A protein has these predicted regions:
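Non-catalytic helical/linker scaffolds that mediate oligomerization, partner binding
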Residues: 1-474
Length: 474
């Protein structure tokens, strides 16, 4: 019997992996979606990677997805003398928006509004929180600070402002240019960095729709404001990424694990995919095996019910990109075969807009457990059936058959789902026979297995799911 992980794997492409052979090996090892980090690399390099991914999809009949990760208003220090200087606790240092070469007394920032955004007493964290200064005063151009935690202050390190309401828009000029490129390439998912409210998502969606594209949005949760507005953000977006790197700097680190679990649960209830990201197997940047703590981190994300887990520098710049995917895949497979992670059968609220079709999908998930079905099939043009089925986390594999080409690779991010392109509009019996033959040919079912089919009747109507049929494979 054929097998695929229900919990999906995102692998970030970078200098260690941006070639045909490595991307093909990453896919063979278990990667489902490839992340293109637009904080780095030119459009030409990203174009080449996109072409490689689509070539592999054609050659190997795969549905590898592409996620474009926009940089967002990343605040950084400027260039430093000797690429880095030492600052010590108690030192006085000024951050200016003038483009100067920095030293131990004066450092520039690329973010022009920093002196206007901060106030006396605000903390400024640099280099993922390894360095900390506190604001003494600001004159709208220069921010005078006292060093709290010192170290080597290097060129172009990131700045986090955990106490400050940043005035920068969620999309910078660079992001808008990168977005145009991503839309022209019809990427599957666009990740928006430093989301603070649902308005950030709404603005991005309007830009996507204005271009007539169907890319879906991932809201990256990495700001305190995002936690405050998490419910409205989940409602507005198509998926969530718990970006624990910046989030763990912006908020107290001890609250991140509980928020991770809360967000996963909220996303399952909302039928929105959720990705757990950052430092999942960080040691594999230089080591061939993960630590026991990293193994537990990945395992806990799977046990919580995350749709996907993500590798960043491990596959982008690490020494063992393929090993990292293999290790992650091995952890996922063991848990999915041995842990009690299935059948989160949520009751559908009576005021739900799709109350009837949602209940039918719930019954399909519940029935799959009772009859030990091997597959649940959703015939859909919007993908709604796939998202809703996945939210119930059935033990049966979920197969989406659709005439919508965009869904084929988009669904690669969704827990437990594999998609097929199916554009015939024939009788119900013919359609279900085609589906059975396809799943049989690909090794997902065999004679005697139970399939649960769901669809909208009549099939050509593109309406809401209103039909469920049990079928035993001949």
């Amino acid at each position: 019997m054929s097998y695929f992980n229900k919990t999906k794997i995102l692998a970030t492409i970078g200098p260690a992996s941006n070639n045909y052979e490595t991307i093909k090996s990453l896919a063979a090892a278990g990667a489902n979606v490839f992340r293109l980090n637009f904080s780095h690399g030119s459009h030409e390099i990203h174009q080449e990677v996109i072409n490689i991914i689509r070539r592999i999809n054609e050659e190997d009949n795969l549905n590898l997805g592409i996620l474009q990760d926009l940089q967002g208003p990343k605040i950084r220090v400027g260039e430093m003398e000797n690429n880095g200087v030492e600052i010590n606790p108690g030192d006085q240092i000024t951050i200016t928006n003038d483009p100067v070469i920095g030293n131990a007394k004066l450092v520039s920032t690329v973010y022009q509004n920093l002196p206007n955004d901060v106030i006396t007493g605000d903390r400024i964290l640099i280099d993922d929180g390894n360095l900390e200064v506190v604001v003494n005063d600001t004159d709208g151009k220069n921010v005078n600070c006292t060093v709290i935690h010192g170290g080597i202050l290097k060129s172009r390190k990131g700045i986090n402002l955990p106490n400050t309401k940043v005035s920068a828009p969620s999309l910078t000029e660079k992001d808008i240019e990168d977005l145009r490129f991503g839309l022209s390439q019809e990427v599957d998912w666009i990740a928006l960095s430093f989301v603070r409210s649902s308005e950030d998502i709404i603005d991005l969606r309007k830009r996507i729709e204005a271009e007539g594209k169907f890319c879906k949005i991932v809201a990256k949760i990495e700001k305190p404001e995002a936690l405050e507005n998490i419910d409205s953000i989940i409602e507005a977006t198509d998926a969530i990424m718990v970006a624990r790197g910046d989030l763990g700097v912006e908020v107290p680190m001890e609250i991140v694990p509980l928020w991770q679990k809360r967000i996963v649960e909220k996303c399952k209830l909302a039928c929105k995919p959720v990705i757990i990201a950052t430092q999942m197997m960080e040691s594999m940047i230089v080591n061939p095996r993960p630590t026991r703590a990293e193994t537990n981190d990945v395992a806990n994300a799977v046990l919580d019910g995350a749709d996907a887990v993500m590798l960043s520098a491990e596959t982008a710049s690490g020494k063992y990109p393929v090993n990292a995917v293999k290790a992650m895949c091995s952890i996922i497979r063991y848990l999915e075969e041995n842990a009690e992670i299935y059948h989160n059968l949520y009751k559908i609220p009576e005021n739900e807009e799709n109350f009837l079709s949602d209940n039918l999908i719930l019954m399909a998930a519940r029935l799959s457990r009772n009859v030990k079905a091997k597959a649940i099939v959703g015939i859909t043009s919007s993908g709604f059936t796939g998202f809703r089925l996945a939210s119930h986390r059935p033990s049966a594999n979920i197969f989406v058959f659709t005439r919508n080409k965009n869904l084929i690779t988009q669904m690669s991010l969704v827990w437990g789902v594999r998609a097929y392109l199916y554009s015939k509009q024939e009788s119900t019996d013919t359609t279900f026979e085609d589906i059975e033959n396809t799943l049989k040919k690909d090794g997902f079912v065999r004679t005697g297995d139970v399939i649960i089919n769901t669809a909208s009747m009549p099939l050509a109507s593109k309406g809401r799911t209103n039909m469920l049929k049990l079928h035993v494979v001949a």
